Amino acid sequence: MSQRLKDQALPLWTETGLDPATGTVWEALDHKGVPCADMQRRLRVQVRQAYCFAMSEEPAHRALALQLFRFAMDHGFEAVSGNLAGRLAPDTSIATAPHDLYDVAFMLLAASALVSMGADVASDLTRLEAELAKLKAPRGWYENAARDLPRRQNPHMHMFETSTALFAATGETRFRDMAEECLSLFRDIFLSEDGRVLEYFAKDWTPLAGEAQVIEPGHMAEWVYLIDRYEVITGRAAAVPMAVLYSAVLAGRDVTGLLPDRYDSDCGTRRAWPQTELLKATIAMQRRGEIPVGAPDPETVLGLMWDQYLDTPVPGGWYDKRDTNGALLSNNMPASTFYHILVAFRFYLSGGASV
C-alpha cells in the first residue's frame, strides 16, 4: 500500500494530474488517465491536492503543495466582492465566488499541512482566519456569504477536521476551541439518538424533515474517524457514544458490505470515498478496542475497496461510482477523492496512530 501511494498515486496526480499551462491541477482524469480538460475546477480541489502533496516526503511534491496553495491565495479571491472562489473556468478565471464555508475550511486544512511541513504561511493563516470570521454565526458558521439555507452539517464537519489539524500543527488553543464548537454542534444538533447523522437544518438549526432531510453513511463514518483524531490530538474526551455511531454506520451497509451514498433503501449508488471513510472508522474503532461483534476488520474493507474501486488499468487511479449491483456508473476519477484515499491509506499503515 505504501508503494501504491509513493510509486503510483502520487506520481499520477503530481504529473498527469497537473495542468502544465496553468500550474494548477485538473478537476478529474478519465478512466484511461486522460485529463478532463474542459471541466470547471473547484478551488477546494486545488488545496485538497496541496494538502495531500504536503504529506509526501518528496521535495518536489512539497514544492507543488506550496505552489497550489499560493495560487489559491493569490488568485482565489474575487476582486470586487473579496469572496473566495468556488469554481474556476478551464482557463482558471473565477466562475463563481460564494465564499463557501466548505471551501474556506479546505484552505485552512491545506495551511495546516504546510505549517506541519515547515512552510512559512503565517500571514496566509491570519488572512484565512479573517475570511472565516466573515461567516461567523451565533453558533457555528453561515454556509456562505449569502447565508443561504439550508444550514449544513458537512462544512461544519470539515471545520472540525481543520480546527483539530490546526491545533495539532500550531498548538494554538483558539483552534482547539473552534474544534470544540463544532463538536458541540455534532452532539447537540447533528447526531440523532439512533446514531445517524442528519445533514440539513433550518436557520435556527431545527432539523429538516421528510424528503428535505438526507443521511449519508459516509459522513457518519467520517465523524467516527475525526472524533477519534480529536481525542488523540487534544487528549480530551469527546463525550460521544462512538459505539452507537459506528454501529449505525455498519447498519447502513448494502449487501456487498459497502456503504451506499445515502442511508435509505432506494439509494442505488455508492461512490468510492465513503468506503475510505468506512476503512478509517473501522481502523479507529479497532485500535480503541470498540469493534462490535460481526463488524468487518480493516483488511476486509480494503479487499472490497480493491475489488470494486482500486483495481483499475491506471496505476494509482480508481473508479468513482458503481450501482449496488457493481455496474460502473462513472466516466472519470475526481481529483478530490485522492484526499480520502491518501488519508485512509496512511491511517491504515500507521495502525490507526496518525496520518
Positions of PLM-derived features:
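Glycan-recognition and catalytic cores of secretory/periplasmic carbohydrate-active enzymes
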Residues: 1-355
